[in-house]
Amino acid sequence: MSNVGIIGGGVSGVISAIYASKNGNKVTILEKNNDILKKLLITGSGRCNYFNSDQNIKHYHSKNEEYLNEIITKENIDELCCFYDSIGIVPKIKDGYYYPYSNMAISVKNALVTEVLKSNIKLICNYDVKSVDYKNNEFIINNDKHFDKLIISTGSKAYPKTGSDGFGYSFVKKLGHTINEVKPALVSLCSDDKILNIISGVRANAKISLYHFDELLKEEIGEVQFVKNEVSGICTFNLSYLVTKNNNVRINFMPFIKVEEYDDFMLKNNNKRVKEILNGILNPKLILAIIKRCNINEEKYFYELSKKEKELLKENLISFRIDIKGKGPFDKAQICMGGVPLNEIVIKSMKSKIKKLNWKFYLILINIREYLSN
């Protein structure tokens, strides 16, 4: 039997504790907040989408891609699903997303807490870890707690208000690991474009394309949300890991037709006023923004527009450009990119190649579902 210490009482730390206890170890969770699983409660807007059935390797990005096939395996996926089933979570599945049947994150938290209590795991809350040392084949926390093995699952820098401020990275670095730069991911994109003042609050089904100057980096289709100084929405989040400098997005508000079919579509509406055509496609605020950009009279019939006006209208309907100055901060990011490189980890066990540490995904250099590592 080993004496196992776990720094961090998030989902990774708690599930690790449960498994370690089942394997006959003495387990202690050290949590800096006054309770465990704080971030879990805000997952999925409080509904807790705890699993996604689409585990295609294409959704995972890392410089060490050769390791991903060892992590994302059918065996591991099945084990995770069986675990949630074993603690009484009945899934409600929507578009591949798994939610508890109650549609409430508290149900998942309560199930995990019950399992912790049943497993005789020692839980110490309001415990602020200041130092981690490795001496004489043991880990020493704050010079007063001693463990044979240590699991660091302290969380990234995303949502620091939950206590996840990235403090664990300093311990990892001190123990000999590399820490690649940690950046926000799954986050909105920032812009100074004044047009956002007009379309703030609008949601539109569209195709959004991210460019570096004029080089296309990636495209997504879905709901794009506009707020003051930001472009948001899930499809936008999925592009955010690629944002550096000199980026722009171009939005196609007519993804329901092929670009080469645009002219035929407009020709069919040749005898309609511009505002009548746009009214069937766009939110009124978007109509106002596009009319403003094109500087055309919305009362004109389409056939009355000049060639230049038609070209401007086409450009703004299928390639509405917004220059991007960066992305949102850590307190708005759902996850982070960066951390411990996968080549410093024994993948099958998640153990450190340097010390007898066990890792959880919060500190490993991998981003999940379109938002992976740098």
Predicted segment positions?
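An anion/pyrophosphate-binding glycine-rich loop and adjacent beta-alpha core
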Residues: N34-I36, L41-I42, Y50-I57, T178-E181, ...
